[in-house]
């Protein structure tokens, strides 16, 4: 190029380079390269469940920093993109977008609408991810609802069935009455809600009054026992007696249990099927009867009492309380704040129903999973405790059944054949993927089977996201075993911290159960993107940032710069100031390269193409040599930080070096020598230009993982027609060093700082001429003295001996 472009138009250039990178397949994975030379990423498949937001940009770019670095140090990169486009989150999006309800229409019709919405939403993701320059190989893309993914997911199910790690049982489960489906423990969240503690009068068979405190009087028809603590002296006399429930006059046993909290309420607790997990424990332990009064729709089913039959739960609670008050069976009510288990998606309070479901054995593997958590490299390490706390808190096996439509079906039927009614029939591996509503088990007719109508929890499929890319579950359930062996276990799982208890946990569980291994060696956990006031972004607050607007205003590189300024794992507020700093950096890089472009035609082509090792002897000036030493220190430090996934530290070191050491000091100090207008020092000029040229080349490479467009543009203008982002284009000058006295160059900078401060305090131009500089505390070499005279505009410099502290007297 004979002329440096006048301006940098980020809109045009970013789009240009994105198209070129795709066309040249810069980011393509090579399946012929060994596992040892390959870096494999288990990319988070974004949930197709709503609007794109700045949080997507924030977390995905942080992964891309590491991936680009690994590619540049020579790794073959397997970096796919997937879409988690099945399950309840997607169904809720479709219902909201189309103003429909799944249960009000045919299953096939609803699934077809889901597929149409998913296709449109995924295209938005692709467009955004290309705009922010994620260096994924799009040929590796997968969808969790695709035929291949359904096959892999069903393989996972059958493999765990074969291994005895999955079972079906009619047992109490968490139920969301709004979405009409069973949920797993990880799908719930605790919410603080205001309620009332109602003190209700029961009687013993002998007529003794007992007061029981409860927040759920609507469950009185399902009361099966009353419990007290065995050490509670108030109630020891109740042993072997029975109580009579108010209103319904049912006789229930009075039983002792250490699970009762003596200081809560009255110390007497009614056990119902089911109010909470303690009720389940008592029901199982004491072999109590089952009374089910709550329906899947969250209404009361109790035809014996028409006053509450058919009412919604809250309505039934109010009605029961009114009747109890009428009959003077409530002694008092206390307003309380209690923790209620709610569905994470719908927000509805959960019920506990007894429904046949599929479960993955989890509780029995808690100790093994804690060991797995410790084997994993956590980035940052303090995130490990979140998984450990979750594993310790697990009290339910993983329920993977969902009573929805748009998901991966269970490859299961139930026999109606005479003599084997209810027998579970599993699909053969050759049939996968199967839809039991349309397909049949081998050897059975349609009339002989009942299909399983449920679909799998979306986490049951996304928990095998590594295997969705490797196309294999285990030795016995594989589509491509060779591909799997080359890619699994993977190197990196990047994800957000709020899904450690779901995606991270379930993926670790599945890999442990399938192949007795970890799914990856490293987990990189990102924080949240917060609003500028550090509050959580939400539509209700109106503070959600739309990426498209920011991209239009600032461009991809500036947004990536903002993301790179956030330490891994930390919650970070969006900042206009940081965005502006990113814009300044892009402009400064452009202008610095423009200056170098002016001079680089003075260099020999062979020296331009050479490495620093090859041209070491041609960098003759002491200050230039100091600059190269500092550059090598930077390269080593930034490389070390990126190898440890500390991208923010690497970015900070590089940026500080560029602004302070390179631009503010080196470039200004060497500028006169670079021009050498009077041809006084041709050797010094060549040394300076050579240093400028190669230092900037390396700085562009260090910046490349973070701001890929501007670095590519400048790299192509100054250095090469090949992409800066190609495999193996990092730098390594670990043992390159000039044996110079560093105090000399650092002394030069210290003197310059003093002079600059003096001129600023006296409102003088930085170029204002100085008659004499009197310097004490150091004596610079002739070379450095000449550079100092040039940069300070000093006619003469006098050194007045060595000392502990540098002092400068400026004389005009």
UniProtKB/Swiss-Prot annotation:
Domain of life: Bacteria
Enzyme class label: ligase
One Gene Ontology cellular component annotation held by this UniProt entry: cytosol
GO BP, sorted A to Z: valyl-tRNA aminoacylation
Key word Coiled coil present: no
Record-listed E.C. numbers: 6.1.1.9
InterPro entries: aa-tRNA-synth_I_CS, aa-tRNA-synth_Ia, Anticodon_Ia_Val, M/V/L/I-tRNA-synth_anticd-bd, Rossmann-like_a/b/a_fold, tRNAsynth_Ia_anticodon-bd, Val/Leu/Ile-tRNA-synth_edit, Valine-tRNA_ligase_type_2
Residue interval(s) of motif 'KMSKS' region: 536-540
Molecular functions per Gene Ontology: aminoacyl-tRNA deacylase activity; ATP binding; valine-tRNA ligase activity
Cellular compartments annotated: Cytoplasm
Motif interval(s): 'HIGH' region: 46-56
SUPFAM superfamilies (UniProt xref): Anticodon-binding domain of a subclass of class I aminoacyl-tRNA synthetases, Nucleotidylyl transferase, ValRS/IleRS/LeuRS editing domain
Sites where the protein binds ATP: 539
Keyword set, alphabetical order: Aminoacyl-tRNA synthetase, ATP-binding, Cytoplasm, Ligase, Nucleotide-binding, Protein biosynthesis
Function: Catalyzes the attachment of valine to tRNA(Val). As ValRS can inadvertently accommodate and process structurally similar amino acids such as threonine, to avoid such errors, it has a 'posttransfer' editing activity that hydrolyzes mischarged Thr-tRNA(Val) in a tRNA-dependent manner.
Family the UniProt entry places it in: Belongs to the class-I aminoacyl-tRNA synthetase family. ValS type 2 subfamily.
Subunit structure: Monomer.
Domain notes: ValRS has two distinct active sites: one for aminoacylation and one for editing. The misactivated threonine is translocated from the active site to the editing site.
Protein name, UniProt field: Valine--tRNA ligase
Organism whose genome encodes this protein: Rickettsia akari (strain Hartford)
Record gene name: valS
